């Protein structure tokens, strides 16, 4: 699923978006100081790469394990992964962009709701070496 790839790209961008500003964080007054609006929004953008990355990873892996596909949820989650840091960075330097936070927040929320709905009827089973299907929660593992 594309969401797994998007998750790892998000993790990479999270590392980069933390490392670059990290070169300047030692300056007490950098971007107006630690509690300034621009600095807080840059931190939020940085952490959003990881947070929404984990949501993408969860959606992709859960979908694979359960054999569930929810293309609309997938697209909405990808949209949220792109829109959230974009709105954060835009808002950091043009505060009027803060009014656009409903787009990534709504996108991610809708993705989760749709994915939960698609998982509702799914069942997960594991095939053993003899071809017998069983629930993974009731599978005995020999050590």
Segments and roles (model prediction):
Residues 1-46, 50-143:
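Polytopic transmembrane helical bundles with strong interfacial aromatic enrichment
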